[in-house]
Amino acid sequence: YYNTCFAIRSGEEYFMTDAGGGNGILRILEEMQVPLNRIHHLFVTHEHTDHILGVIWMIRMIGTAIKKGNYEGIFHIYCHDGLIDTIQTFCRLTLQKKFCDLIGDPIQLIPISDRETRQILDMEVTFFDIHSTKARQFGFRAVLPDGKIVCCPGDEPLNPLCEEFAKGADWLFHEAFCLYRDREIF
């Protein structure tokens, strides 16, 4: 766990959430002994720099591994449809063409929508719009194989419209720690 970046392991594979604000995520993953070639699913909550800039480093490093034959399969990046162009633009402006050319296949940017449920690894993951007034942002609720529930409702106070996703969660990964009604105070 790093800021609001975290990875859930299932067997030898990982589902990662956000990637931090730069290449520091690479050091954190190394320290946590999370191999890049085992991360095949990444969810990006929103466009703020402390959540999205590390995605570019992930694409670069996983792209390098793909080019060297050290990464098998597809790298799935899930985000709301508005972030797809943002990520592609960042990549186009900062990465070599050989990495940008991997976007589409084997690096896939996958748009998700409010209340959409997907099977990711061995988890049932439901994405939801957190109803942010600052920047469009999504969270998720995942049911793990053992029935435990993980909820990541983003980095703003939990909007009452999203309570159903957090209710009953065994693990709640949240960056904001105040009630929605108190958001202007904090």
Predicted regions and their residues:
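Conserved beta-strand hairpin/beta-sheet module of binuclear metal-dependent hydrolase folds
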Residues: 1-32, 136-154, 171
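Active-site neighborhood of phospho(di)ester-bond hydrolases with catalytic His/Asp-centered motifs
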Residues: 17-20, 40-46, 54, 80, ...
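Short, glycine/acidic-enriched loop or turn micro-motifs at the edges of active sites
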Residues: 21, 49, 132, 157-158, ...
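Active-site metal-binding motif and surrounding structural segment of the metallo-beta-lactamase
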Residues: 23-76
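Alpha-helical elements of the RecA-like P-loop NTPase motor core of helicases
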Residues: 26-27, 53, 85-88, 160
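Metallo-beta-lactamase
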Residues: 71-136
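Catalytic core of the metallo-beta-lactamase
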Residues: 110-168
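Cap/insert and terminal regions of metallo-dependent hydrolase folds
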Residues: 157-186
